[in-house]
């Protein structure tokens, strides 16, 4: 019993640790920004002095670096990281690890995370099932073939273009106000549950229809580079919210020289303009 009690105390008081590996050689520098609570984090594998909330340049003494401390915000943007271990960093609320060489990212222990920026890596999967507080997600320019957002009901901004998504279920993300899912392989996009949506960028997919009748707050729509034509393009423009007596909305339905399957007739343009939308074709 005593041994068990000691074990529990040890675990509950465990320090928060971030570990990363970089392809940069020893002697080169990395630029990091950290916000932390309490004492300055302890560093191994690099020299420098952390200053909370400020970008600091560190010199590598090893290609594997360990940061021990209560770091709540960690920005390691563009440092040639090949691995990032956050499984012992429970205090983290915001992570910026974009423009690196990460092939995996385990966030299962970062339950306090509200903002995630992991674009321009080599991620093939992203498990966000434990990150229920997540409100801002930027994961563009990876190799994601699936993205399960069913546990992320607090999500407000989603930026996931330039992946390999064939399906995107947004039915659980009713707080969503901005969505960019362009340059994927989507054939269907249902935004009927996203009534707070103000911006939708879904260009460069394979959509044949788009119903916006529930999106009364929408002000900005880019849907060029799809396959919406005939009766479906007419249904789309008729479903646009009426912005009469409001700031004009912006609707980009055709854009050259992008491969274009949309067909928008003058009569369709007139319908959109009649609802105070600026139409770019």
Segments (PLM) and residue ranges:
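Conserved hydrophobic beta-strand positions in leucine-rich repeat
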Residues: 74, 95-97, 116-118, 137-139, ...
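Tandem repeat scaffolds
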Residues: 135, 177-180, 191-193, 198-199, ...
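Conserved hydrophobic position(s) of the canonical leucine-rich repeat
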Residues: 71, 81, 92, 102, ...
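Canonical leucine-rich repeat
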Residues: 84, 105, 126, 147, ...
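Ser/Thr/Pro-rich low-complexity tandem-repeat tracts
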Residues: 76, 87, 96-98, 108, ...
